[in-house]
Amino acid sequence: MAPVIPAASAPHKPRKFYQHLYVQVLAAIAIGILLGHFYPDLGTQMKPLGDAFIKLVKMVIAPVIFLTVVTGIAGMRDLAKVGRVAGKAMIYFLTFSTLALIIGLIIANVVQPGAGMHIAPASLDPKAVASYAAKAHDASIIGFLMNIIPDTPISALGSGDILQVLFFSVLFGIALAGVGDRGEPVMNVLVSASQAMFRLVHILMKAAPIGAFGAMAFTIGRYGIGSVANLAFLILTFYITSFLFVVVVLGLVARYNGFSIFALLRYIKEELLLVLGTSSSEAALPSLIEKMERAGCRKSVVGLVIPTGYSFNLDGTNIYMTLAALFIAQATDIHLSLGDQILLLLVAMLSSKGAAGITGAGFITLAATLSVVPTVPLAGMALILGIDRFMSECRAITNFIGNAVATIVVARWEGELDKDKLAAALSGRISVEDDDLPIEATSPAQ
């Protein structure tokens, strides 16, 4: 089965500004903020709208990953490329995740957002973070690795565990490619199912403004804008650091690899606003997979890099972990030597690898890190518990951008990037809102 070729069609009528998804999501976020601020009780009641939308998106994440990975791998002529793509992706993830941790450490030492607070560790209530500490205690490297192997393929798809789905999908894709032409009927079915699944993603994205409105109204109504005032300096430091990481570090990576970080941000602006509104990068995962394919990244690369990156390439979470850990130490007047900070960095490198793209995962990984580093009191997390929700948006957005950049970079390294399609997508010549644009299809006979 050959790749799907776009059929000639009449040019689309230009959309009015309010018909664009990013405008609708932005307006929904603004309305949610106003409702949560002026009518907090009513705002908190909007939570089911955000939860329902995230559940709708999570419903399609597992099948989207399965179909993308299987059809991508089975359509490759050289299966050795699968190993090369995975290896290059892990090198990229390890390099930039470590760099993000180091940047968070440096900024915390230079800016010192917790200095002068003089909070006695004995005065902190450990019960406030007990549930997070318990979740962190249950996590271990061996347990994390063993959990990647699903009990059954159905349980992986049913639970929606990204790494379990990815693990089975890679094995099944390799097996399907191994049977050659006999697997083509199965491949044809999967390609058609993939196209139908992405059409479903388009349908679900129409509800994004409702989900963003509900999630933002709840956040402001529940926590209040005023709750950030006392720790505004920490929040500001984290936001500025993440912004500079995206613009400077990822910007240089993008420029070196032949594209503009700002053009990429324009290309994924709808997804970024969705992540901002829902505080979950998972909410935009299916849409990111589709957009990276349309931007010229080969399906097999997209299917491997993005799902893996959601656990191993968390730049925003890594910046947050070292910055927050040093903030707690500074606020409680605990001096961390260079050796203590290096230990903190090494532990954070390991504990951050199991975080999923869900709200609150960064807080749990921070608890896992502090539970291993005895110098910083775990109870100190109570200091940032109230504002963590306001920092999770920035974590999720930075993680999301990092995975978009990683996908393009790894595709280029592997020679699986269509530079003309990338240029067309980033310049706006390809509209991903057009319903008649086909999804790339691959087959064993390609």
UniProtKB/Swiss-Prot annotation:
Q: Name one GO biological process term.
A: L-aspartate transmembrane transport
Q: In which broad location class does this protein mainly occur, judging by the first location in its UniProt entry?
A: membrane
Domain of life of the native organism: Bacteria
Give me the disulphide-bonded residues.
none
Membrane topology type, per the record? Multi-pass membrane protein
Q: Give the UniProt entry's GO cellular component terms.
A: plasma membrane
Pfam families to which the protein is assigned, alphabetical: SDF (PF00375)
**Keyword Transit peptide appears in the UniProt entry:** no
Q: Where in the cell is it found?
A: Cell inner membrane
Q: Which GO terms describe its molecular function?
A: fumarate transmembrane transporter activity; malate:proton symporter activity; succinate transmembrane transporter activity
- Database matches in NCBIfam families: PRK01663.1, PRK13027.1
Family, according to the entry, reads as follows:
Belongs to the dicarboxylate/amino acid:cation symporter (DAACS) (TC 2.A.23) family.
Q: Write out the function statement from the record.
A: Responsible for the transport of dicarboxylates such as succinate, fumarate, and malate from the periplasm across the membrane.
What is the protein name given in its UniProt record?
Answer: C4-dicarboxylate transport protein
What organism is recorded for this protein?
Answer: Azorhizobium caulinodans (strain ATCC 43989 / DSM 5975 / JCM 20966 / LMG 6465 / NBRC 14845 / NCIMB 13405 / ORS 571)
